[in-house]
Design a protein with these regions (language model features):
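Beta-strand-rich interaction surfaces with strong enrichment in secreted/lumenal proteins
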Residues: 75-77, 136-140
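Short linear motifs centered on Gly/Pro in flexible linkers and helix caps
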Residues: 3, 33-35, 128
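Short, charged, surface-exposed secondary-structure boundary motifs
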Residues: 122-126
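Exposed extracellular interaction/assembly regions and N-terminal maturation sites
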Residues: 12-121, 156-174
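A conserved acidic, glycine/proline-rich C-terminal tail/linker
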Residues: 128-138
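Extracellular disulfide-bonded cysteine-rich modules/repeats
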Residues: 145-153
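Short, Lys/Arg-enriched N-terminal segments with co-localized hydrophobic residues
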Residues: 1-7
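Short solvent-exposed loop/turn micro-motifs enriched in small/polar/acidic residues
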Residues: 10, 142-144
Length: 174
């Protein structure tokens, strides 16, 4: 990592980190343009704004790991792959035609997505227990430019969908 003119190594804290004046994440690495089908990773994509620029893209979230301790290290190990709390923020920059945000098939979505259309109609979508795909088509299922979806790994096999608004046209479908 670069800090000023200095390189800063990755640092792992095992206890809480307090900032009395906040953390500000800025710079060119804070947005990533997704221009093709992408298998997302925590290291490259979590906590960043993911600009979806593939109208029929398939963006696959990483498998949720709740306990990834190695045989020689524990919860505070730098190489522990536990990804609970990893958040993925999507912004539709190119209107969807058949765009999917999907899990590995084992992880499922919980939470709600609000879909709104230009005549003021809106509809909330609550995923079924088996739901592992969010599909946008730029019309009845949302996905127009400006749509946003946020998902966070919250537990074994569970991604929370929150702070999400899909913009669409015509009669809303779920």
């Amino acid at each position: 990592y670069k800090l000023g003119g200095y390189n800063m190594a990755k640092t792992t804290f095992s206890g809480p980190v307090y900032s009395k004046n906040g953390f500000i994440n800025t710079g060119p690495g804070m947005t990533i343009s997704l221009t093709a089908d992408t298998d997302l990773t925590v290291a490259a994509h979590a906590g960043r704004l993911l600009l979806t620029n593939d109208a029929d893209g398939k963006f696959t979230l990483p498998t949720i790991n709740v306990n990834s301790n190695s045989s020689v290290a524990g919860d505070t190990d730098y190489d522990n792959l536990n990804n609970i709390g990893a958040t993925f923020n999507f912004y539709v920059e190119t209107a969807a035609t058949d765009m999917d945000i999907l899990t590995d098939g084992t992880d499922k979505f919980k939470g709600v997505i609000l879909t709104a259309i230009d005549d003021g109609a809106k509809k909330a979508f609550y995923p079924a227990a088996a739901n592992d795909v969010i599909t946008m088509n730029g019309g009845t299922k949302g996905g127009l430019v400006g749509s946003v979806v946020t998902v966070t790994a919250i537990d074994d096999d569970k991604y929370l969908v929150h702070n999400s608004l899909l913009l669409g046209t015509a009669t809303i479908a779920t």
